[in-house]
């Protein structure tokens, strides 16, 4: 299959290599021509995925429209807040018959839209049955080394989800399917915010009790928002829900947990972000999800606390005190 992977960060590069090794005809798009030339010359992404050699068959290109026209499947692996701008670059092309697989996890700031909603809004010729999401506990650092990983391909069309499953599945990259793309995208977006909270807990020096509470009550927030927006509760107990939440809150590879940890140690958000060469999606998602939760009337206290610490400069100690001294309630609330 002809597959275009849009976005040459760590995850886009990892998936491009995985698909090329499987025998697909894969072309990886890099936004900046000079970066594309460097990738092609070095046959390795030394900036975002050092040490992973490109298969000879993997081609690199900065030319978006010819790539999209050539492709049968388009994998969008750009940061969530850059998705709209990227796909506007080919919104006039005929996309009939093509499958679009989004792998970026986030909610768009300003609109509150999930990534599949952005795709459908910007690409008027695309129908929901052409769009899928590939989410789950899948750090690029481990997938690129061939370590066992499981994810879920989700689409409103089971046939589309199963096609994505067939295309991506390998002996070490197991792909499940479901049709709850709403639940999958909500879970995959909110978990990054909860991971920032978990990192803050680590940075302060709190113990396992606090971490367990953050993960568990974070799951409750994900579940409430998911249900409000039409997702299915069972999705939250799957790979895109608890699976991705656990790995993002605990892993040393988690950029979102790292941001939180540094905030917990007293550093400013600007200082932390300026020293990172990759995106921590939870920073943007905390603003977008906080605004979305207010718009739809869903109480998300951990999300609110993270937003306040990141963007309103609320002291970490005060945010924690406010969380712990809220009105008492039943666990299911």
Curated annotation (Swiss-Prot):
Its EC number is 1.1.1.94. Pathway: Membrane lipid metabolism; glycerophospholipid metabolism. It comes from the Bacteria. It is found in: Cytoplasm. Pfam families: NAD_Gly3P_dh_C, NAD_Gly3P_dh_N. Sn-glycerol 3-phosphate binds at residues 105, 136, 138, 191, 244, 254-256. Keywords: Cytoplasm, Lipid biosynthesis, Lipid metabolism, NAD, NADP, Nucleotide-binding, Oxidoreductase, Phospholipid biosynthesis, Phospholipid metabolism. One of its GO terms (cellular component) is cytosol. Belongs to the NAD-dependent glycerol-3-phosphate dehydrogenase family. NADPH binds at residues 10-11, 31-32, 105, 140, 255, 279, 281. GO terms for molecular function: glycerol-3-phosphate dehydrogenase [NAD(P)+] activity; NAD binding. The active site is at residue 191. This is Glycerol-3-phosphate dehydrogenase [NAD(P)+]. GO terms for biological process: carbohydrate metabolic process; glycerol-3-phosphate biosynthetic process; glycerol-3-phosphate catabolic process; glycerophospholipid metabolic process; phospholipid biosynthetic process. It catalyses: sn-glycerol 3-phosphate + NAD(+) = dihydroxyacetone phosphate + NADH + H(+); sn-glycerol 3-phosphate + NADP(+) = dihydroxyacetone phosphate + NADPH + H(+). Its main location: cytoplasm.
């Amino acid at each position: 299959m002809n597959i275009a992977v849009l976005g040459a960060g760590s995850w886009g590069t990892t998936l491009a290599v995985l698909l090329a090794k499987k025998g697909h005809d894969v072309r990886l798009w890099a936004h900046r021509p000079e970066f594309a030339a460097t990738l092609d010359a070095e046959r390795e992404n030394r900036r975002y995925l050092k040490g992973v050699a490109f298969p000879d068959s993997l081609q690199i290109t900065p030319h978006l429209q010819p790539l999209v026209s050539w492709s049968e499947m388009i994998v969008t692996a750009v940061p969530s807040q850059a998705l709209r701008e990227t796909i506007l670059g080919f919104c006039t092309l005929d996309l009939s018959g093509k499958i679009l697989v989004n792998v970026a996890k986030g909610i768009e700031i300003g609109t509150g839209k999930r990534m599949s909603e952005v795709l459908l809004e910007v690409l008027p010729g695309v129908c929901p049955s052409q769009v899928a999401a590939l989410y789950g506990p899948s750090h690029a650092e481990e997938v690129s080394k061939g370590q066992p990983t499981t994810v879920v391909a989700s689409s409103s069309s089971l046939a589309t989800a199963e096609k994505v499953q067939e295309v991506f599945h390998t002996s070490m990259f197991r792909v499940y399917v479901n049709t709850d793309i709403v639940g999958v995208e909500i879970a995959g977006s909110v978990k990054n915010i909860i991971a920032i909270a978990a990192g803050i807990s680590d940075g302060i020096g709190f113990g396992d009790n606090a971490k367990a509470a953050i993960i568990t009550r974070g799951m409750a927030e994900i579940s409430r928002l998911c249900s409000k927006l039409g997702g299915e509760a069972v999705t939250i107990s799957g790979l895109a829900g608890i699976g991705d939440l656990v790995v993002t809150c605990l892993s040393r590879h988690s950029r979102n947990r790292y941001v939180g940890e540094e905030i917990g140690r007293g550093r400013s958000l600007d200082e932390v972000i300026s020293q990172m060469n990759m995106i921590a999606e939870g920073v943007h998602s905390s603003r977008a999800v906080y605004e979305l939760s207010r718009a739809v009337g869903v109480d998300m206290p951990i999300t609110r606390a993270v937003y306040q610490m990141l963007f309103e400069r609320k002291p970490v100690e005060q945010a924690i005190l406010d969380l712990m001294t809220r009105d008492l309630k039943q666990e299911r609330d």
